[in-house]
Amino acid sequence: LSEGLRAAIRVGVGRALYRGGIVETLLGSIDARGVSVDSVLSMLATCFSRSVAEKLNVNNIEVVVELYEDLDALLDGDVNNVNRLKVKIRVEGATREAVEGALTGCPFYTMLRPKIDLEWG
């Protein structure tokens, strides 16, 4: 937390225990070699789609999260801006504005928003 007196409540927790090549998580045991960037991005897509589906009461939504590295930022030595996420969303029966509003209620989206390029359709 930042400077000064602040109040905070825990809204979630993740746990992982690595032991002998196996990672034990709240979702079960996973072979550590099976954990990849793609699996983490899939979990982010799951969080985003759930947030939109629940807030907008829609049943058909597709979310794709892609990780990109900005080579210009890398070459410029701007390591804080090298990684970017592209989030592509398709939702039937909802406007772009409604979807963006629903995403702002997702804590992961809010934390990562400065690094996200949102695409519609």
Which sequence ranges carry the predicted segments?
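Extended beta-strand/beta-hairpin segments
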Residues: L1-M43, R50-G121
